Amino acid sequence: MIFVCGIHGVGKTHFCRKLAEKTGRMVFSASSLIRRKVENDFKEKQVDSIQDTQTVLLNELRKITLQTPDYILDGHLCLLDNKNKIHRIDMKFIKQMSISLIILLVDSPAKIKKNLKERDGLEWSENFIEQFQNSEIKYAKEISKKLDVNLQILLSQQSEEVKFGESILLPIKPQYAEKILCGEKRYEYRTRLCNKNIDQIYLYSTHPVRAVVG
């Protein structure tokens, strides 16, 4: 799952739409998934019980993963409570989301303020927006390091520059297939591939075909 995050008003919806066109993946919004189960007013971008809503979100994501494991989630790493205090999503929830890539969108506080005013009628100060965005950036870096997940931080207006590796299909000699597919033997591919930006490698047994793994 590709997790696209960033504070409110940074342009995640537009970016996710473009990303879906590029990758062929479906897009889901964290807040929309939560609304399916919880009647909550997100107008002010505040959440009363962050832990409860994240539990709901995880349950909805599990259902999606059963149908389509490769998708895009539009969400946040930090949220506001009903007193406008910034809270991190608990790491235990993030860990269960099975994220393969984090894309964090950022922009200038002035631009985000303008977007929020025009779109939602919200009046957030630039200082508050900067604080909120810095919290999201700091936490994204911590998550990337602790969970060993790739992180790309992009300026919203440069978001078309996001790079994805190609997927390649490689053969396994029959005598090595079982050991490689069960993890007893490492698969070493040709050195010429090392210069490529590879996102996923799929292996298959040349004869007979026993399994394909990603």
Say what each PLM segment does.
Residues 4:
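Hydrophobic anchor at the beta1->P-loop junction of P-loop NTPases
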Residues 9:
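Walker A (P-loop) phosphate-binding loop of P-loop NTPases
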Residues 12:
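Conserved lysine of the Walker
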Residues 17-58:
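Conserved substrate/cofactor phosphate-moiety recognition/catalytic segment
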Residues 42-82:
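Conserved nucleotide-sensing/catalytic segment adjacent to the nucleotide-binding pocket
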Residues 76-119:
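ATP-dependent NMP and nucleoside kinases share a basic, alpha-helical "lid"
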Residues 118, 122-162:
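Small-molecule kinase domains that catalyze NTP-dependent phosphoryl transfer to phosphate-bearing small molecules
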Residues 164-214:
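Structured alpha/beta reader/binder surfaces that contact nucleic acids or chromatin modification marks
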